[in-house]
Swiss-Prot record:
<keyword id="KW-1003">Cell membrane</keyword>
<comment type="function">
    <text>Catalyzes the phospholipid dependent N-acylation of the N-terminal cysteine of apolipoprotein, the last step in lipoprotein maturation.</text>
</comment>
<dbReference type="InterPro" id="IPR003010">
    <property type="entry name" value="C-N_Hydrolase"/>
</dbReference>
<protein>
    <recommendedName>
        <fullName>Apolipoprotein N-acyltransferase 1</fullName>
        <ecNumber>2.3.1.269</ecNumber>
    </recommendedName>
</protein>
<feature type="transmembrane region" description="Helical">
    <location>
        <begin position="549"/>
        <end position="569"/>
    </location>
</feature>
<feature type="active site" description="Nucleophile">
    <location>
        <position position="446"/>
    </location>
</feature>
<comment type="pathway">
    <text>Protein modification; lipoprotein biosynthesis (N-acyl transfer).</text>
</comment>
<dbReference type="InterPro" id="IPR004563">
    <property type="entry name" value="Apolipo_AcylTrfase"/>
</dbReference>
<feature type="transmembrane region" description="Helical">
    <location>
        <begin position="204"/>
        <end position="224"/>
    </location>
</feature>
<keyword id="KW-0012">Acyltransferase</keyword>
<comment type="similarity">
    <text>Belongs to the CN hydrolase family. Apolipoprotein N-acyltransferase subfamily.</text>
</comment>
<dbReference type="Pfam" id="PF00795">
    <property type="entry name" value="CN_hydrolase"/>
</dbReference>
<keyword id="KW-0812">Transmembrane</keyword>
<keyword id="KW-0808">Transferase</keyword>
<feature type="transmembrane region" description="Helical">
    <location>
        <begin position="60"/>
        <end position="80"/>
    </location>
</feature>
<feature type="transmembrane region" description="Helical">
    <location>
        <begin position="38"/>
        <end position="58"/>
    </location>
</feature>
<dbReference type="Pfam" id="PF20154">
    <property type="entry name" value="LNT_N"/>
</dbReference>
Amino acid sequence: MFYNFISKDSILYRLILCFGIGIGTVFGLSPFSFFSAGVFASISCIFLFFSLNRTSIWKAFLWLLILSQILNFTAFYWIPGAISRISGANTFVSILFFFLYGLISHLKFFLFYTLFRFSKIDSASKTYILLIFPAAGTLSDMITFQIFPWYWGNLISGSIVFEQFASICGVYGLSFLLLFISSTFLILVNYYKYKNSKEFKTSIASLICIAFIYRFGLYRIGYINQSQNELKPKNLSVLMIQPDTSPGTKDLKADASYLSATMSKVFSLAIPTFENSPSLIVIPESAIPFHGTIDSEENRKEKIYSSTMEGIILYLSKHTGADVLFNELNLDENKLRNQVSLFKNLDGKTERYNKRRLLPFGEYLPMEKNFPFLRSIFQETSRYVPGEFPKLLIGNKIQNQRSFLPPEISKLNEPKTYRYEFSSIVEHTNKIRNLEYSYSILPLLCYEAMFTELVLDYFQNEQKPEVLINITNDSWFDSELEAYQHSGAVRLRAIETGLPLIRSAVSGISEVWDARGIPMIVPIGFHETGTRAFSIRLDAIESTIYTRFGNSFLWIFCILILISRLIFVSRIERKS
């Protein structure tokens, strides 16, 4: 009936489907997280692909280009402002880059459609679509480069039960699941009147598979809640702060009043007001911008080292007996590193992880060597150098740690005073005697947490992480929608790894999830100032299937499906 009014070949029909994908995407992602919206987006994608099959591939690609920009304007409209604030580019350049971003980040639709088109499926009622459509979409998710990554699997966030499937197949497995559910729905709708048909029976078999996955999700939610190690529980008390300080633009680097106010705010929030001190204090990315705590000649020369910043970290640890996790910048052989650092109360030493996945045009300038003039356009862009290796940060829980006052607070800019306190042999020996346990942190800096591959790296070694901590600075984006989309994508890392995840953001959203991706605290909202004190369990019973095998089986499965279909199509064409 619908097609009596709108032709499948019409511009209006295709525009409606493009907007269906865009609107379904924005409402499928956080903070809305409507499961039905994700299904709606994927079904719109199916019908768009069938409509594009009726035209030339070049016209189809033109429509996919239009789709990429519609997605930009509906789901990621905050990007132009973010580009301007992060890089210092003017409005014209930011808008131009916005269009370019839409093309690059949505290249997956071009691959997705190409795989689908050459699979020669001529109708949404064909049962082949049950596997071909999900396999093509999942492969395109896994292969194509994205700057701010979103996957079809992120659109399943409205169902915490289905999300548990990520512990087996990761976010890409959720992509396959969502597209499989949508394809099953279409087959079922087309053949529900023909209950004796092969197609209807196939759709019922698909529904049974989906029901098994749902049952697994229910089981995992209950199982993890009941399977904590009660014999030797490892409870880690944490204090997380959100200072909501303004972004550190380059013109503020020499502003003493700005830096003083920023450091004072961080310091006042991080000093616990309760009787029981935490074992770990988490300070978000760029809470204290521009500076680092390594007192080296090159850091002093470039005015990166801050004695006050070092004094604050030492004071907090001495006052509370806690380890302190924070973000800093340091020069390492003339290479500027963006780091997650853990100051350890046990021995007064600092472990550091160098950020590996840098943000283009924010933390480094692509092609700057070939086009040096770009620096004059993107003036706020930093010159960070990426790290090469994953690195766990090892903290320590010490028994009977009590809050007490270290040397005078007036000496914050004289860290040598505090360093001396940590060098006491007697005190160090006493701490070792009272060491309860050590714990391992998987550090993720800013949007690194959106890339599941960066997390899987840590599970290839003998020593495994016990908690994921993502410190981030979303204040550059100044968009509540972006903050929720970023946070929602990060949450899946907890389910994939079966580990608790702490997300500390300088301006929000700051959250904590357990191994099932279920919130453990009331989040600190966007542009709120606050703290959260909580306790997490670090006694994961076993690794998830996903951390043991990664994406290998899903790669093989999707490739075999598409190759089998292409072989089948080529044989049919030869016979004809």
